[in-house]
Amino acid sequence: MAQATSGAARFSAVPDAPRSDDAALVAALRADLAAAGFTVDRVTDLVGPEAMSAWSRDQAVPARRALRERGSQDPALSALTAFFLLGDPVRSSALDAALHTVGASGLVRLGLVEESTEGTSTGTATGAGTDPLLSAAMDLRPYATDSSEELWVASDLGAFQRPGVLRHDHVLGIGGASTTLVQSTPRRPVATALDLGTGCGIQTFHLLAHAEHVTATDISERALATTRFNLVLNAPALGLDPERLEDRVRLELGSMLEPVAGQHFDMVVSNPPFVITPRTPQESDTERFTYRDGGLPGDRIVRELLSALPSVLAPGGTAHLLANWEIPHDPQDAPEATWSRGPASWIPEGTGAWLIQRELQDPCEYAETWLQDASQQRDPEGFDRAYAAYLDDFASRDVAAIGFGMVWLQRPEDTERTAESRHGALTTDDAAGSPSAPRGASRDADDAAGAPNAAHGASQPGMSAPSGPEGERTASGTVEPGRAASSSLPRIFETVPHPIQQPIAPALAAEWERTVRLGREAADAQSGAAGQPAWLERRFTVAPDVTEERHGTPGAEDPSLILLRQGAGLRRTVILSSEAAGFAGVCDGELSAQQILTALGVLLGWEEGPSEQLVAEIAGLIAHGFLLEVSD
């Protein structure tokens, strides 16, 4: 698709997308939105928190009711809310009054409105003639986090704002999946970052807060045009010069890793088009929902991406993404026990990996989720055909379940690259990509490129015995043993279905750092470079969010079960041995771990010191953050 305006900046004038070729007009829109008070907090005050919560679930009735009752208190804000957030047609005069400088005509030039086909207005104005009804061509919503300035983010309208099946080149907005990725991405300072499958640009906005330069890619010109518009609209808040965006942001058109082949990044973030979709011989690109469907059969898009991502990571670089994976039927084990076999085999040797499965769906649940996501139920006959095709597709590969979760990859800092020699960059012809705790105006349907709420149906943390840095299979997952070299990175696969702290990124980063350190110390001790793990000489205290729970038979002298529960982070619950419980009970930061174990040995009559099992159990408590190191 060619740019609409000759000489315009790349992606600034793409048909059927918001335009950013007139920076002054976009700046005027920004000023008008701010003057109208079109912010998360002001909109919530106007319609009420319950209506905003319903709106996040794609339910507009409560907000419309609130606008009818209270909209006259703030006509400008009411008009913008009805127009951009609810998708209701509004009179041109009402938009002129709400946006004093830009007005309705400016919105038309920016590609944000179209003439309405409805005959009556549910908004704030009446009348006809020279005051036509206009409808939003794009969703434009306020967005903020606890640590950022207010932003406004454009994307395509959702199904509840514009009834009917979504367009196949739909530009995804802010939803549950994109928010999950925002909250699970660590915000360490980096020189270069890659937003793979940028969609509306939400991940790029957050990356700009801690990355010197961001490359954002997508297979969709409309998505890149929308991202560019959002960057120009929010340039001051993002620290950008709208006339020199390329100084900090580069937009690249192409499939998956093709646009960045041969380049290396300190951080990669992606909500890739991982949704499994039945393939048909006669399908064309125009029939595919490119924002969520990479065009490959089964979970191959995830398989190839996990294999190829290390090839674009700089030494020490990390990748953070959401993904799903098929779990084949196993007559001996349930999917909960076998899900990691596939992902573990896809990741190149030497690459550190942490996969957290958050949800498991059977084929029927999965089909229903994604058919409804694109509003395909609005075509009953087509829905039934597509549903049957999903079940046939899964049956052809003997799929028992589909897992969804978070992925963390890291390239070692001090080893030669192995991924590039074993895996080329991902270059599928048909692959596509659209992907701090955010507040307010974001749909919580896990939207189009995301997945169902990973915490759905879970209320209590699962229980497991803690695993040490060298790893063992537990009820919560698998930690593969580290290689002999002290530079090896861990490979962790675990299931965490219960609600977790948000944003979770700080806790994940801290746990990963502890696990890497403990693994290297264990490898040094095993190789003879050190007599014993170095952590034994350090002092620890119980984390402030940790509580102990004891269960016992009435009248019994000793408990039959001792639990430690976390109130923060991944909110793990672990079963402790009596020895480990005794160790944790003495950790007040005064004595080293070795001193405590020596005292326990005297008390319990050990002849040869603590068992390897106890040492691994304590190391697991340290890695998972139940015990925190005390600094000198």
Protein language model features and the residues they cover:
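SAM-dependent Rossmann-like transferase core, predominantly class I methyltransferases
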Residues: 114-118, 129-193, 198-210
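Long, charge-rich, low-complexity alpha-helical segments
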Residues: 75-123, 127-136, 180-186, 194, ...
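Acidic, low-complexity/disordered tracts enriched in E/D and polar residues
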Residues: 3-79, 132-136, 141, 161, ...
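Core SAM-dependent methyltransferase catalytic element
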Residues: 405-415
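S-adenosylmethionine
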Residues: 166-177, 187-188, 219-388, 401
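Conserved SAM-binding motif I beta-strand of class I
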Residues: 213-218
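Intrinsically disordered, low-complexity terminal tails and inter-domain linkers enriched
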Residues: 117-130, 236-246, 415-484
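Short hydrophobic/aromatic beta-strand or adjacent loop that forms the aromatic wall/cage
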Residues: 401-407, 624
